[in-house]
Amino acid sequence: MVMLDTLANAMAAIKNAEMRGKGEAIIMPSSKLIANVLRILEKEGYIGGFEYIDDGRWGKFRVKLLGRINDIGVVKPRTPVSYRELAKMPEHLRKYLASRDVGLLILSTPQGVMTHREALKRKIGGIVIAYVY
């Protein structure tokens, strides 16, 4: 089986486990990008935590779910945004959030993976890769 977008597969695994009411989700294969996104979700209180499991091949993440995620996914096509665009929150980005103050956009920036709120504080832009609310 060829996995073209491991981040999309990880977000789908989390969303499906949340919809089924499960307490944990297994994400495989692992990557640094997925680890950084999970770190953000943990810091913002959407997941209870995660751990890396070395299976001798690609590795896996076990994610503890709290039942706080209503929707999660990737943004396709990956959209580059400047700081000014992010401050205005254009329509093509607003559609991924429930409302202005609810949810997060996750960006890949030159300074690392971060939320849109953190990018606004640092006054930098990046590529929008995922959303959660």
Swiss-Prot record:
A Pfam family it matches: Ribosomal_S8
Keyword field: Ribonucleoprotein, Ribosomal protein, RNA-binding, rRNA-binding
Record's keyword annotation contains Ribosomal protein: yes
Cellular component GO terms, alphabetical: ribonucleoprotein complex; ribosome
Gene3D superfamilies: 3.30.1370.30, 3.30.1490.10
MF term (GO), any: structural constituent of ribosome
GO annotation terms (biological process): translation
Keyword Cell division in record: no
InterPro entries per UniProt: Ribosomal_uS8, Ribosomal_uS8_CS, Ribosomal_uS8_sf
NCBIfam families (UniProt xref): PRK04034.1
Function summary: One of the primary rRNA binding proteins, it binds directly to 16S rRNA central domain where it helps coordinate assembly of the platform of the 30S subunit.
Subunit and interaction comment: Part of the 30S ribosomal subunit.
Entry-linked PANTHER family: 40S RIBOSOMAL PROTEIN S15A
Assigned protein family: Belongs to the universal ribosomal protein uS8 family.
Protein name, per record: Small ribosomal subunit protein uS8
Organism: Aeropyrum pernix (strain ATCC 700893 / DSM 11879 / JCM 9820 / NBRC 100138 / K1)
Gene that encodes it: rps8
